[in-house]
Amino acid sequence: MKTLNRRDFPGAQYPDRIIQFGEGNFLRAFVDWQIDLLNEHTDLNAGIVVVRPIATDFPPSLNTQDGLYTTIIRGLNEQGEAVSDARLIRSVNREISAYADFDAFLRLAHNPEMRFVFSNTTEAGISYHAGDRFDDAPPVSYPAKLTRLLFERYQHFAGAADKGWVIIPCELIDYNGEALQALVLRYASEWELPQAFITWLTSANTFCSTLVDRIVTGYPRDEVAALEAQTGYKDAFLDTAEHFYLFVIQGPASLAAELRLDKLPLNVRIVDDIKPYKERKVAILNGAHTALVPVAFQAGIDTVGEAMNDAEICAFVEKAIYDEIIPVLDLPRDELVSFASAVTGRFRNPYIKHQLLSIALNGMTKYRTRILPQLLAGQKAHGALPPRLTFALAALIAFYRGERDGESYPVQDDADWISRYQTLWARHRDGQMSTRELVTAVLSVADHWQQDLSQTPGLVELVTADLDAILTCGMRDAVKPLC
């Protein structure tokens, strides 16, 4: 069986127009996959040069396959049907190591056709590294590397206003474009680069903040033989991802035409502010996960997919989304309903086995950031606590007992919470503390909740009643009235 290369598998090639910091699975099944579709169906005509931003030889370079690789996109489509689509990605031209070939890295700035910079250098990538110097070849941090590359471009084109770049980071931090720009400006200042360059940075370049959403499951180790039998070639860079994707870019409206999204819209939104979309994702997708986990797990279920195939648990989650979360969010209802429908479809994806215990990590913080705002907004709007979001809090407290059907399971959270719960549940088991006292002790940790939740009218009473029901009747019977 042949290995992928451009000689044996000839096809379209595109001129270098995009620099991409990061060679990982996510960008390849998200940004590069979208660029490849735009290249095929529009006149975008943009090839990608991947920059490996760290000093490592693992994984091997994409150059071993001439930049070619396959994405396998699978899940439930908009009609609820299971689909699996293989696509040979031809838009990556080559990979460069910023460490092994620094001169080639700098020469990317000399190409007049270069226009876009994408990146995913992990959440820690957009950060300041105190030791970075202009003369380093290269500097350590991604923002410092980008500053050096931008200065190279500024010098090469004598500060031409039309040679700036559109910079679109995909790192999972809030307002990533603004954070990246601030660090680039900091390095430019600390390195005492000319004021004219600093002016050019802000006037000729556009830094866009983004929200990215797609579960990328990466190299399908257990299925490689079967998948390569289908494609007919060996591919060391096979990349799998879910069917759903969403790319929200905070930037000028003109960006839609420049990326040819006017000719092939994809699920990309060019917006003035990503904040409402971030809130929607956190509240609906992440919030539903956080509400689901302690309820489903204590009902004897182990994965998200199994939970969504359980009629009662599925009903609980969907009612929480549609009746308690969506009504308090600040976006058009039809948009929210459409997004929620996609979310529940994603949860049902038969190709992804999402373990509930893996999502349970840091559940206390997740509840505070993902569910509590909607719980309090619902109470304010309707004068009553939303029953399912409140029940989810009781289920979360019960989850921290660390035991299901007589079997212990790992609970992963901040050490303070682990210690606190061990003490509280031990005292409760020994009859030294009532359920109400336990609930009050949890809700009154103001440092965590950023307020004393035990003072929220009715919350202690309702959570106590729910927790008593869980402890007395078991999760199945306790949750039934809310399904």
Swiss-Prot record:
- Per the UniProt entry, the Enzyme Commission number(s) are 1.1.1.58
A GO cellular component annotation here is: cytosol
Q: Which domain of life is it from?
A: Bacteria
What does the record give as its pathway? Carbohydrate metabolism; pentose and glucuronate interconversion
Q: Keywords in UniProt for this one?
A: NAD, Oxidoreductase
Q: Single Gene Ontology BP term?
A: mannitol catabolic process
Fetch the InterPro entries from UniProt.
6-PGluconate_DH-like_C_sf, 6PGD_dom2, Altronate_OxRdtase, Mannitol_DH_C, Mannitol_DH_N, NAD(P)-bd_dom_sf
User: GO molecular function terms here?
Assistant: mannitol-1-phosphate 5-dehydrogenase activity; tagaturonate reductase activity
The first-level EC class reads: oxidoreductase
Q: To which protein family does this belong?
A: Belongs to the mannitol dehydrogenase family. UxaB subfamily.
Name of the molecule in the record: Altronate oxidoreductase
